[in-house]
Amino acid sequence: MSSGCLALILHAHLPFVRHPEHEHFLEEDWFFEAITECYIPLVRMMQRLVDKHVPLKLAMSLTPTLCAMLRDKLLCERYIRHLDLLIDLTARERKRNRNHPQLRALADFYFEMFCETKRFFVDEYKCDLLTPFRELRETGALEIIASAATHGLLPLLQQPVATDGADLGVPAFASARARSTPAATAARAQILIGRDVYTDTFAAQPAGFWLPECAYAPALDSILQEANVRWFGLDTHGLLFGSPRPRHSIYAPCYTPAGPAAIARDRDSSRQVWSTKGGYPGDPAYREFYRDVGFDLPLDHLGPLAYGVRKFSGVKYHRVTGPDVHKELYDLVAAKKVAETQARHFVEERRRQIDQISATGFDPIVVVPFDAELFGHWWFEGPHFLEHVIRHAANNRDFQLSTPSEYLAAHPTQQIVEPAASTWGENGYLEVWLNPSNAWIYPQLHDAAQRMSEVARGYACPVVEQPRKHSALPSDKVAGGAPALQFDDRVLKQLARELLLAQSSDWAFLIKTGTAREYATKRIFEHLSRFNRLYDQLTTNDVDEEFLCECEFRDNLFPNVNWRYYM
């Protein structure tokens, strides 16, 4: 009998997208779709397992930006409106398809799904989806881990990198150790603010930390140790190419020189699931993501859900069928049977793998991380697959589901290894986020980080409190009727928010892939523009409070952000 472990880790993340200045905003749909198709189905799946006393051990990150959106009143109100529009559309679809039994059955399914989703979100959890995650964490079934504040790519924020050479994407800083620079404080602030948001949200300290894009470079372990992190994840080669080489390959954690343990992804196990070509989601029976009534039906029939724009609705009537062929209608029952068969196959493959590794004389841990949005959004049957993986794993005696924290508690003695610079992006390094299409971002981010560090140090320990002049009040009035230090604190907090939002790795990714390139570019420019305007006003003692209030209204995340981390 093996004593090995399988650790499943889900990374739930979306960039902060909130546009109160618009009644409808297309990119807010990313959030609405993820709640409907991914987060609520995953919560309900985990609750079913807990209620049925099925042994469940799962690790999951909920990034700070996602937590901020889940607790935002405006976005929750807009999500309910979105559900109401889907319910209206599918009610009309039931009528339109009344003479087509298979399409009518699918329309019935979507109508009932959206109604039940609304009941769950509004009635059961009072528009607070963080509550069930907290409750699952408290049962011990779910280990929630922290992540960086706005998903900044930490190695690229850690210190300035050349963006005009021939080797874009190759980490020239791979052997560097910690240095106190403004860029280093930018990475530190991302980690420590992310830790703080976790503590505010879950009233606990995180044991694990999800590095955005699994991107690691030397010296990050020191910041993670400062944040009291016990473990973090890497891609396979980040540990395999470490120094010295890990004795147990990627199948045991290794402590870093600063202290936190690094665990590595089992790439083959991951690809078996997420690859659309060779992996499970490409099965012909599964729902076709790209065939959507939002593109098939007339705009006037789509009604206010579309508000005159072609976009995904979430109502999809067809299955994968095959590449470049006519798409057949979707059969939910058949798709679920395939998911159950694949779940059994996945568990059996992991059993064989763990038995084989255990025969070498130690208790392995096979770590399989995924983007959470794969399950339900990109792969509609994913939550059903995952539920049956957990059920089958619970019934086998050859290995057990575990979390990295539990494994480390049971196996505290491990090798010390300096991991290699790495990411889980294409080709394993930085080229997705640092290439000719997006390299222009980083000099501006580093300049802003330099400015943030300067003002943080300058305002951290003022000698006396002086009234702050600003353009909306006479010079003898203190801004907002508040003490000057309190007003300065507001400005410094907003500076931190704008810098953090500009640093999101999502923007560089979207620019590289060409998906929402214009929107991503605009977001970077807008946040840096607001940052620079507030910086200039603060350093010239002439803050426009109306502009500050506008920034606070639009970019309202992290109310307790600690700007002193930039010192």
Regions found by a protein language model. Give the residues of each.
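Short, low-complexity intrinsically disordered segments enriched in A/P/G/S/L with frequent Arg
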Residues: 460-461, 471-475, 479-486
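Active-site and substrate-binding clefts of carbohydrate-active enzymes
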Residues: 2-57, 62-105, 243-461, 485-567
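Short, solvent-exposed turn/loop segments enriched in Gly/Ser/Thr/Pro and often Arg
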Residues: 61-66, 148-150, 208-217, 404-408
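The substrate-binding groove and active-site-proximal loops of carbohydrate-active enzymes
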Residues: 25-36, 107-124, 150-163, 173-186, ...
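Hydrophobic faces of well-ordered beta-strands that scaffold small-molecule active sites
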Residues: 8, 58-60, 144-146, 207, ...
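CE4/NodB-like, metal-dependent polysaccharide N-deacetylase domain
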Residues: 162-211, 349-369
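Hydrophobic, small-residue-rich alpha-helical packing segments that form membrane-like cores
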Residues: 222-225
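Acidic (Asp/Glu)-rich catalytic clusters
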Residues: 49-53, 128-145, 358-359
